[in-house]
Design a protein with these regions (language model features):
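Acidic, low-complexity, intrinsically disordered interaction modules
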Residues: 37-74
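An N-terminal amphipathic alpha-helical segment
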Residues: 1-51
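C-terminal edge-of-domain segments
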Residues: 69-86
């Protein structure tokens, strides 16, 4: 497990964040949400955009409650993965 600070530094260099390790450490109460939905495209299921959006918004809104400014989006060029920036 890396720290949220280390994840933010990596995200600055790579333009994407190590989402699972960073957010689970900062917000353990949403660990199950992340584990269930972080790799939505890897199970071969065809998720609709609105399905992606509700998880992005759920994570974003939870982070905002803790005072983070958050941008969350899915990148669908290399499969579906969630990138969250703060």
């Amino acid at each position: 497990m890396i720290s949220a600070k280390e994840a933010r530094e990596i995200s600055k260099k790579n333009k994407e964040i190590l989402t699972e390790v960073a957010i689970v450490e900062v917000l353990p109460e949403i660990e199950e949400l992340i584990k269930k939905n972080i790799d939505l495209g890897n199970d071969g299921m065809d998720w609709e955009a609105k399905e992606h959006s509700k998880y992005v918004y759920a994570i974003r809104d939870t982070l905002k409650e803790y005072g983070y400014t958050v941008t969350a989006k899915f990148n669908q060029t290399d499969g579906h993965y969630l990138s969250i920036y703060w």
